[in-house]
Amino acid sequence: MGGKNKQRTKGNVRPSSSGRAAELLAKERGTVPGFIGFGTSQSDLGYVPAVQGAEEIDSLVDADFRMVLRKLSKRDIITKLKAMQEFGTMCKEREAEVVKGVLPYWPRIYCKISLDHDRRVREATQQSFEQLILKVKKHLAPYLKSIMGYWLIAQCDTYSPAASAAKEAFEKAFPSSKQPEALAFCKDEILNVLQDHLLKETPDTLSDPQTVPEEEREAKFFRILTCSLLALKKLLSMLPKKEMHSLEEKLMSLLSQNKFWKYGKHSTPQVRSAFFELASAFCQFLPELVKAEAPRVCPAVLLSIDDSDAVVCPALWEAVLHAIATIEDCWSHVNARKGVLPKLWTVLREGGRGLATVIYPNILPFISKVPPGITEPKLEYFRTFFSSIIQGLSNERALASPSESSAIITTFMECLRFAILQKIDEDEQRQIHQMLIYDQLIPLTDAVLQEPRLQNGPLFYQIAETLSSWEAKAEVSSDDNTNEVFQKLLSNFWDRLLKMCILHVDKLEADEKTLFAISDMLEVLQNPKTATKPNNRKSLKVKFSDEDESERNTENGKITEVRSNSDSEIQADLQHSSILRKEPLENLVCNLAELSIVYVNEQKSEQHLKFLSALLNFFSSNRVFQVLLEQGSNAGCPPAESQEDMKVHNENPSVQFLYMNLITWLKEDWRKDMHFLVDILYSVLNCCNSDDERKVILDDLTKMDLKWIVFLQIIQKACSSTTKLSLISEWLKGDMLGERLVMLADDLCHLGLKPIATSPESSSSEKWTVLSLVLSQHIKNESLIGETYVERIIDKLQAALSKAKDLSEAGNTEPSVSFICDVASSFFSSVKGCLLMPSSEDLLLTIFQLCAQRQDATHLTVDLLVCKLKHTWISGVNSLVRHLRSMQNQSTFLHKSALWIKNQIQSSSLDVKSLQVLISAVSDLLSTLLEADRQSGCLVGAYVEHVMPNRTEWETLRESLSAEWMHKPLLEGRLSMNCEHLGSCVKLCGTTKLPGHLCTSALLSKMVLLVLENDMVKGNEDAEILVAELLYSLQWIEELENPPYLLLEYLHMLEEMHITYEKFSALSNTTNLQQTIFDRSEEHGRLWSLTMAKVIRGENAVSREMTKLFKTSEGFLPLTEGRLHTLQCLSPFLIEEEKRELVFHCVAKLMTCTQTELSSTDGAFGCLAILNSSLNDKSFGCDHLLPGVLKIIISWKNDNEDSFLFSCNLKETSAQLLGFNIEMIRYLPLLLKYSTAPLADNEWDFIMCSMLAWLETTSENYSLYHVPLVQIFACVSCDLASALSAYFEPAAPKTTENLPVNLVSEWKEFFSEGIHNLLLPLFVKVTGETKTAAEGSFQNSVLTSLGEALTYISKDQLLNHKLPAKFVAGQKTNLPDNLQTLLNTLSPLLLFWARSVQVSVYHMLSKLMPELPKFDDEDLKSYGDEEEELALSPPAALMSVLATQELLLENILECIPVGEFAVIQPLSDEFCLVLGYLLTWKLTLTFFKAASSQLRVLYSQYLRRTKSLNKLLYHLFRLMPENPVFSGLTSEVPNKDTKTFFTEELHLDVKGTGALSSQIPHLACSVYHITLKDLPAMVRLWWNSCEKRVFNVVDKFTSKYVSSVLSSQEISSVQTSTQLFNGMTVKARSAAREVIATYSVDDIFIELIIQLPSNYPLGSITVESGKRVGVAVQQWRNWMLQLSTYLTHQNGSIMEGLSLWKNNVDKRFEGIEDCMICFSVIHGSNYSLPKKACRTCKKKFHSACLYKWFTSSNKSTCPLCRETFF
């Protein structure tokens, strides 16, 4: 069994090997053999009783219990702990009979494991024992004696949880009445166990020295000692008295042991503490035994008096007191003078060594028991004693702890009183009394006054209490002259106290804290009852948030009552205080006051003035003021008032003092702290005879130019005390103060609103605080000042806020607004019924308006201030709603605010941010109303109604929305219109302010959604109307082709604020809403119909209510515009049967239409519109009817050709006629698309001729394209031409077999020609006149349709164009004039700011590009090969456009690093610029590819010189996405199936605007792909010249996404190539990316292997040698080098490179020698042969090579023979 000594790993739940062995034995034999345990102090044999045979007993124990008992004997703590927990669980869960089987084994296990070193094990043991007791109950009785000793020890465990668990088990086993009996039953066994532990056991006997460390053994031993001592104490305290005597003998033997008494000096504090606790118990329960052992007890206890351990002290002093109380002669057993008292003095001098709170309360009982003999001489004894205490008080530990110092001072005073009361002879008594006052009490008082940490202690209260007791004794006459003794004592005290106080006061630099301490002391001496003693801790209360608010608001009132009681008690005490106290105290105060006023008058001492204020606060008597006046007059202080005024007040010294001194001090400007002067003022007022006198004084003060802080403090102090309030209430309510406060409010408001504030902020703050206080502070539901003045002040504040709203330059309004806010908030929240005043409601409205407007509109920039404003108005609204609920009144605020909001949202003056702020404010207001008025909801309902527009206002708001929205649905055919007012221009929507309809619908929708969220039924009808209007607004935005950013912001705001249809549907049933929208659609049509379609699409179903009108075909007659639009929008959602019925009805109606009804809504126009809408979706089995409709149209034409707008001027044409023609034109493409029956010749003639005639009308009326219906007419005419072109373009046999014989040829020769002869000049004309047509504008839709039609133009038609000639001066060209004109006309349109124009021009030019190189080819023949570095420009018209685009693009993209994807917003100016640039390059590359190899060299040379290609490549790596996955697929690593922009072809459709966001990235990838394919050498050159970062970006991107595509295309082009070489075969291996070329001529055989790199075409193509026969090594190397050079440096495919190389080799075999410079026969760039021969050596060279040789070497010698070259 290896690994025994290893630690058990976490998760190893298998039992130990011995456990498994036991388990195995149990399974095999059914029993566990008995193992005899090792013996301890007990004589039993482990858990196996020795009485019976082991096997016999073991069979009674359950197998699981056996296993657990085994584990409990293990050494490992975790094993024991888990086993014990398992044992407890088993005891709880198993049956009682099974558990009883364990009892014989339990005592031995319990006795051992309950003393375990690990505390968790001990705790678990007691918990398991409890479970065992609960299960076996009385069956435990036989085993009690063996358990009880250890059980009692466990109850005294030093680990509290274990002790608690043991006590819990004990209480479960025995009721409290039976516990003494149970202990008495086992007392002998308990004593045996305890004595063994106390006298016999050692650390080594309790634990195995071989396995347990010494430290652990000792810790366990000391713990068991402690527990045993405590257990013995517990036994003594719980045993019945009658059982005590039987224990005395055994306890006597314990007490006789010296070892026991040594525990009092034990090194472990816990043992000493337990020993002294036991000693106390002995004294308490066995006093006779203790007296017998007095010689041991007294020294053990009394001589330990200086033990300073915190654990020991409480028990020690308890034992000391018990010992001296129990043993009468205890002092005879110790030497008190040498042994006990010196130790006591040491403890006292050291301040109790941090244990004063424990030791000092025991000092008085202790010294009271010291016999007289020991205390002689008493004078020295008491001097030493009290001096020691005072010295201890100066100890730093005592000073730092208030509780320590309090305990010392309290003990000092108690012992002082004790010493004073000692009965001794008179002389000694007098000496002791003098010593105690002069040398002890007064010095202590002096020390406390000078030490701030002691000033708040209990000394002053203790002195007051002591004086009271002495005064009581002094007043009662007695025979033994006690009263005289105490009178003398008091006299001495007051004399010495006066001298001490004068010492502190009579100096210029008097310490302020000391002075305050003196005043506090005098206050306490005068009124000890009023002040709360510092050692009485404040009662702490938990306050819950749901307490009634009124309680919180009346907190100030409660304070007031408390203070008022205090003040009244002061007066009572003053009247009834003893004459023995009053006179000396008043003398003392007068002396100190007189001294202070001298320093104040002569030295301007501030601290003396504050001291004087404190004195007067509690001693405001006329005598004191008289003293002050006398001293003041002596000092010659100038009077503050005229003599006349003085005469009036001459009688009252306090008033004289006010006018002579106090006012002077109050007026001093330098003074910041005024509160103590205000206290003096209250002292003066207190001495006044009447309220009138006080009012006159305060009114005088109000008239004076005093600082506002004085009045603030006067009012604040009055609010905190009803006594003070009663002194000034007349003045507060008076006119003088009221008028002054109104003026103050006016000044403050105006000051804040001036451009430059002049007042310092601090004084301003004080003034605002005064206002706030007088408005918000109410006493007994009355305002401090008169109601009239409150209202006037509120008016001023409201007026100021209104100005703050209107000021344009209001940088300094914020402090003012902030202060007004504080005042208002305090007023609203604390004053009940404050909103009864109209001015209060106006103020509330103004604050709300400030919050509900954008910060830049209100010029408030601090967010904190806005939050403060919000908090203010919300508290105001809460107060208002509570008031409305109780009074049932109407609210001006709610009415006015609703009207203001209504005006704001309907005025069209808000932007998105302003609207958002307004909605947030209104939401907060509504939430507050909902919360406060949840039951009825009437306030909220009324508020929503006030804000909501009426029917007329809604119509006005809808009409104010611009009609720009109509363009898109009209153009797409979703709606059809023939109205007169559409004959004019359409006003565009604004881009700075939101239309009123949008603001109104958003705000009100938010309001009703809030109402619905709060489960209020009221408002449901409003909700449907409002959400319908909101949907109308959203539909208006959706229909705009290019909505301004403002509207996109608005939509984002709605999402953010959860104002959505989805939110409404989640809160309410939408059936009624759908019905409302349907009704409006039927009535009004237009945008309501589109809104209805959107709702239906969202619901994915048509409700029955919506289709009930269409059950019969007559349900929608007569057709109105509303019904027409409703039908058009409903048609996609109708089932086939309903749709078929609708179409039948329309066709029937068309057949019966008269000439007058053709263009009316209820006639042909309406029916055709419905028919077109129905067909737009899909065919549904009515195909056979379609040709019939065509016949009807032809019949109309025959009968009334004037109704058909053929080749005519549309200026005077009615809107009805235009609408009718538009619907007819729309019908024809649908007929071609869905009709299955072949059309007759005359029908085709009608369609073709009508189409051309309508196009002529379109061409002739281009000046009227700004008129919506004319524009739509032009668009649908062009769309018809596009549809016909598309129909005839493929000319598949299936299409042509059903057509008339000559129709296709007629189309090609006449009609198609006619279309493009009309449209191409029109296209040029329209683009020329609308240079800045933005994408999505009205005119642009015509260009889109025109461009779409022109994409079908053929190459020949382009070449035979009839455009006016257009040439550019200085333009180099080889093109014929006709072709050059076409290029010069169309190329600049690639710069046009409309995508449709750019794409259509690209499609037209791409048909021309392959035709252009041949004109340069002819010109190339005239070039000689003498010239070097020839360059030829691609078409000049394209290049000039490219140059312009490069300049513009550089400005946009230069700031973006190469490799970082630049997102281009669709249809922005940047989009059109980038699109034009990429299309231009696509055309250039198409042109390049169509050129011959020789031309390519020249073109590439041009691109290299202009660096255009380099710029392109840099731009492409800004325009291509990092992960070019197609159709939103995301895949980091491309695999064969991943579609990327490189694998998927780009289809540029003129009208296709589906995925515009991916169009630029896809086009950029397409251009890069073509560039790599057709110009690989140039790209490679650029790549090698790039900086390292760009180099890596390009390499990584190309390798990852492009190389694989290009490699496979190159390999497949080799495989599918039809090019044949004479004597050379080419094969390709796609898997290995290899091409193998085999060349054979006569006996020569060459095999070349061309390997494509992984980053093809950036990396070099490697050419490896295969087999070769008949070729010299040098020649072979030359040829391999040539092929590698061709493939690397020529811009073409592998096949082209191989062709060039083969020609070179062929020429070599024909006898033409290599050029000795490039070692090739054919030149790599211009493909020329070596022609220039040296006259000396006759060798021939290429002209280009020779030119390069001459320029690089700066010599004109032959490269070979070095002779001069001629």
From Swiss-Prot:
Compositional bias ranges of the Basic and acidic residues kind: 551-566
InterPro entries: ARM-like, ARM-type_fold, LTN1/Rkr1, LTN1_E3_ligase_6th, LTN1_HEAT_5th, Ltn1_N, LTN1_UBC, RING-CH-C4HC3_LTN1
Repeat positions for HEAT: 100-138, 193-231, 292-329, 335-372, 512-549, 606-644, 672-710, 916-953, 1184-1227, 1314-1355, 1406-1447
Entry GO terms, CC: cytosol; RQC complex
Single GO term (MF): ubiquitin protein ligase activity
Region (Disordered): 1-20, 529-567
Reported function: E3 ubiquitin-protein ligase component of the ribosome quality control complex (RQC), a ribosome-associated complex that mediates ubiquitination and extraction of incompletely synthesized nascent chains for proteasomal degradation. Within the RQC complex, LTN1 is recruited to stalled 60S ribosomal subunits by NEMF and mediates ubiquitination of stalled nascent chains. Ubiquitination leads to VCP/p97 recruitment for extraction and degradation of the incomplete translation product.
Subunit record text: Component of the ribosome quality control complex (RQC), composed of at least the E3 ubiquitin ligase LTN1 and NEMF associated with the 60S ribosomal subunit. The complex probably also contains TCF25 as well as VCP/p97 and its ubiquitin-binding cofactors.
Protein family per UniProt: Belongs to the LTN1 family.
Annotated protein name in UniProt: E3 ubiquitin-protein ligase listerin
Source organism: Gallus gallus (Chicken)
Lineage: Eukaryota, Metazoa, Chordata, Craniata, Vertebrata
Gene designation per UniProt: LTN1
